[in-house]
Amino acid sequence: SIGYSFIKLNTYEDVLANFRAQLAEFNAKKLEEKGHAASFSDAEFNRIMIHMDNHSVYESAKILRDKYILQLDNGENVYLDFFSNDTDRNIYQVTHQVTMDKVHKEDVVYKNRYDVTVLINGLPMIQIELKRPGVEINEAINQINRYRKFSFKGLFRYLQLFVVSNSVQTKYFCNENEMVDGRYNPILKSLVFFWTDDKNTRINDLNTFTSEFFCKPAITEMIDKYMIIKTTEPVLMVMRPYQIYAVKAAKKRVLEVKQNGYVFACTGSGKTLTSFKLAQLLREEARVDL
C-alpha cells in the first residue's frame, strides 16, 4: 500500500545481483547519455564493488551520499549516484528472510537470517526485526546487535536505520560504527526512539508506524535530511521526532512566514543538534543568505 516492490532474495549472492540491476536502472539516464546500455558488464560491476566493499559503517554512510566516477568499458566516465532525495527517482523494494553465511560472504562469522529488509536502489538501507506480541522489544535490539557483530557484512554495512517491533511497541534507531579495533559496542537503549506525531503522541502500532514512517517521502527525508554523519569523529546519528518537527517548523518560519521565532526545550533534549541541523538545511536554500 505504500508503493514498495516485493522481491525474493534468499542469499547474499541474490542481494548483489539485485543491487547490480537496480543501480543500473537508477543511473540509466546517465549511462545512456554515455552511449552505454542501462546495465553493467562484469568488469564494470567488479570496479563498483571494489569501491563499495570492505568499508566501515561510517565510511559506507559517506559513500552512500557521494558520487562515484566509474570508468565504463567504452572508455567514458560516468558519475554514479547511490541515493537521491527524489522519491520519483529512487527504487524502493522490500524483502524478507535473507540469509547471510560464510558460503556467500567469507567474513560472516555466524549464519543469520533476517526478518525484513528495505532496499533503496538495491542497497539494504533499513533492517526490521519483529517479535511476537508479549515478547520484550529489547530482544529484537539485542538480536540486531548480534547481527552487527557477526553477519552485517558487505552491502549490509550500508544499513542506515533499524526498526524493531512486537506489534504493540515499535521503535527506530540508527546504525553505529564499529570501534577502531574492530569491536562493536552494543547500541544503547537510550538511543532507541519511539516515533510520534507532531503533538508528541507515540505511534506504537506497527501498521500505523509503517504507513507514516515508511511512506516514500518520509523515509527518504529521514535518510537525506535528518541523519547526521559527523565529520569530527566516525559517528552516525538520527534525530528524535520532536527534533525533526522543530526543525521543520523553524525552517517554515524562516522561509515562508518571515517572522522571528524560537524553539524551546528542556536540558538534554538535543537543542544543539536541532540548531545545527536547522542551520545546515537553511544553508542549502539558495534564497537564504547566511
Identify the residue ranges that each predicted region occupies.
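ATP-dependent helicase/translocase motor core
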Residues: S1-D289
